[in-house]
Curated annotation (Swiss-Prot):
Keyword Ribosomal protein included in the entry's annotation: no
InterPro entries: P-loop_NTPase, RecF/RecN/SMC_N
Superkingdom of source: Eukaryota
GO CC entries: condensed nuclear chromosome; nucleus; Smc5-Smc6 complex
Coiled coil start-end: 190-415, 627-713, 749-786
Listed name of the protein: Structural maintenance of chromosomes protein 5
Compartments (UniProt record): Nucleus; Chromosome
Domain comment as written in the entry: The flexible hinge domain, which separates the large intramolecular coiled coil regions, allows the heterotypic interaction with the corresponding domain of smc-6, forming a V-shaped heterodimer.
Chain residue ranges for the region called Disordered: 375-420
Record's compositionally biased regions (Basic and acidic residues): 375-410
UniProt keyword list: ATP-binding, Chromosome, Coiled coil, DNA damage, DNA recombination, DNA repair, DNA replication, Meiosis, Nucleotide-binding, Nucleus
Amino acid sequence: MASQDSDEALPANYKDYPDGSLLRVVFHNFLTYEHTSFLPTASLNMILGHNGSGKSSIICGICLACGGSPKSLGRSERIVEYIRHGCTEGYVEIAIADKQKGPQVVRLTIRVGEQPKYRLNDSATTQSEIADLRKHYNIQIDNPCAFLAQDKVKSFSEQSSIELLRNTEKAASADLDQQHIDLMKQREDSTSIEDKCTTSENAIKRLEDEIGKIMPLVENYRKKLALQSKLRLLEKKMKIMEFEKFDREYKAELQNMDGAMIEYREVEKSIAECEKHRKNLEDRIKKDRSQISQMQRSCNEILAKVQEKGDKKLMEDMMQRAKAKLESAKKAADQHEKDVEKARKMIDQARARLQEAVDTLNGYEEFQSEMKSLEQKYSTAERDSRQEEDAIQKKSYEMRQLENKKRDEEQNSQLNRQDRYRVLQNFSSDASKAYRWYQQNRSQFKGDVYMPIMDMVLKTPEAAKALENSVGVRDRTMFVCCYKEDELLINGKQHSWRINTSVVPAEKIYSEDIDAQLPSELSRLGFKYLVSNCFDAPAPLKQFLCNVSGLNRIPFGGSDVEKKIAEVSQAIEQTRYSVFLTANIRCQNSKSRYANNTLQSQSATREANTWRDQFFKVSPVAKRTDNSILEEIQKLKAEIDIRSEQLREKRGAIQKERDVLRQEQMQWKSKKQVHTKWKTELASEMAKLEALENEVVDISAIEEEYANVEKKAILETKKMLENSIRWHKEIIDKHRLIGIFELSESICKSRVNKSNSEAETHRSKLEDLKSVKDAAEDLLKTALNHKKAAASALMKECSLKTLDESKMSPAENKIYSSLVKMFEEADVPTDMNTLDQAITSEKTRLKLAEDSGEDGSIVHEQRLKVLDDDLVLEKTRQEKLIENRARIHDKLGDEINNWRKEVETMIEQINVNYVQFFDSLGCRGEVSLEVPENPLDIEKYGIMIMVCFRKGESMKRLDNKVQSGGERSVATMLYLLALQQLCPVPFRCIDEINQGMDPTNERKVFDIMVGMWNGTTGTLSKTQYFLLSPKLLHGLDMRENVNIVMVNSTLTNSHGKHYDTSAKIDATFAKMGISA
């Protein structure tokens, strides 16, 4: 490199340089340069120098002076590190050609501890202003197609097709690159719409999936609601029919009671009338007796007077009395005959009625006997029912006890798991997160997943310490799976946690490991058990611990072992066991690798830390045997339901039989009452007849007496006629009255007897009616209680106080009308038996629905409504998004098509040059636009380079895994050359692109480059080129426009003065066969 005397020097023909070309480059304390100046030519500048001479420093200085970033150089990203070693300040200065304004001088000054400073034409400026200046001249230092630093050559050849397209656009057309950027922004907007559409589709799918999952629960819930609604409707109808039934029964019993009361009152009235009539007759008898006594006294007085006056009156009186007596006897005899005849007729009538009643009582005794046996049977059945109720209550108590026990065990198990989980959280947050996720997604796993901390149950007091000194810390949170699929599921790449997992399949579980017992010889030495015996765990987990920690081969001993530790160690050495534990010591025997002897190590046991809590001694899961509690509870519940239903049906059947029996009893009782009535009537009439028959009226004796009296009276009358004629009439009258009174008294007495007999008959009848009335009252009370219970049930079920519409309130009328309409619409049975069967059937269907396992609720119903509403809203939103997406895609597709046409035109021009260059090498190559599957994915468009360096082979895509480094360098260089005609940049820099090329290809590429720059047309004839290389081939076609710059590194300034650069170059060119 020639050194200039002045940093202000410019090339002699600098005015001919195209705008943006570099006229001068000055380095001061920059990288390898202390101070130097470099004047490039306007065409090809080949900068040659051995490795480490400072060739790449020129590229770095040009890039930084043009406002570039250190990141684009592939070296240090700290700009202060570009200062020469040992210095605190340095600068780079470049002069840019400009025919109108003159050379534009840009200086970048770098100082340690300060920000870099830029100056333009000796005036302070900013990096952004320098970037604007760079854009003005179209200097593309950030485009590897125009500016390819040494450390970026490899990355350029390895860049993707997408990156190659972007860089090609930057080099060929800023407008095309900006259009690509704008399209990518539009694509991001459309992608956002597509993401929203995808999100909406996923949301719709999620909503539909959730609706699909919840629909069976809602349908089952609706089915149960329908069944419950129908069951309630049937039960309402049953309550109404029961109320109507009991109301009818009550009215019938009330009518029977009224009939019994009427008959009872009539009999009471008859008795009162009889008593009143008897009293009146007795008063009449008393009155008649008083009159008779008075008349008799009067007659006696007259008789006394007659006697005093003469015997005639006495005779007359005697005749009169005899005559009256005769007449009275005749009348009484006539009446007696009539009464006897009447009594006989009444007796015949009573006998006929009694016989009819007797006939109706056929079977009464059998009924009574059957009734007694049935009552005994019903009593026995009721006693059995009460015993069954007691048994059911006992079973219910047992079931509640089991439920309480199960609930307590579940609570204890839950608390145990929570305590263990807290220990796990303190141990490892990732393991706790993974375990919680496993618990929440357990249904996705093929088998169970176990963990020592969560699933081990300690059995002995020393178990915690034994495990602390036997199980590794890493293994304590190990997830032990039964299937490989479960391990991939819990420890897949989709999770953020880092956990330890292992798989122990069922076929790898060996009972001789997990069930190993302490050998008798070790027991004699004082060992208590193997460590694997001090805890319980699921078989896969226990097998895992036996595999990794050898717990089935570690015996645990007490203080006896510690006392004779040497003897025990010697005995252990003879067995297959190498490790044993005591409460305070851990011993291990191992074979020496260098001598055939046993090495023994002892260490103090660590205190229990992980398993020190008491809850590790309790199983976190209910015992297997206790799992039967749920089955027993379900069994007891089913048995209670069945036995309760059977008891209800049994009692219902007995009650129905009792109701039928009571109705039959009432019929028989009515018949019995009729029989009793006529039996009493017959007895009364027969008593009357007997009394009448006992009353004998002897008329003949009275007639004879009368004749004697008459004879005597005639005889005496003749003697006393004159003396007694005056009083005779008076006496006769009085005796007539006396006879009347006596006859009246006799008749009254007879009537009193009759009245007494009738009263007794009525009293007997009243007693019978009283029992009937009492029975009717009991039945009425029973019917009333049934009616009240039915009314209460009616009010509770139907909100109705009565079924009489005239007595209903408007609200009740509305309810009743609604119920009637619902009954008609639901075709509810009107027969109680049919209705009862329907209720039983609906209860069975409801029970089946409740036991189906798909138990829904109002929460699911509400959730379904929310999901349906969300689904409608989401579908509406999706339709709008799809419309927007279609509109945006149409617009974007048109703009992409327009951009694509320009890009394809550009690539076709590149391809023409690229094919031509490869033909000159005797190889094949082509460039094409790589179009993504979705033409709208503008960010996925790229440039695909296909090459073939050997005959007979097909072209393959340029790739760092297929072609060699030299082949990639050739393909990359030719692509850059093919791109030059489309890239109007003022200068280009390529650093060591020929590294890895074979000499033949390197020579051909160089010839192509020289041929292109020797032309007089096209952009290359006006482009400045910097090509850096550590070597130069012999026999290259060097033209006049090729500027060779040699870079040498010197140790001191004086050494440089003695270095004859021109002579060195001439000698080198002569050796290479190049004319200078």
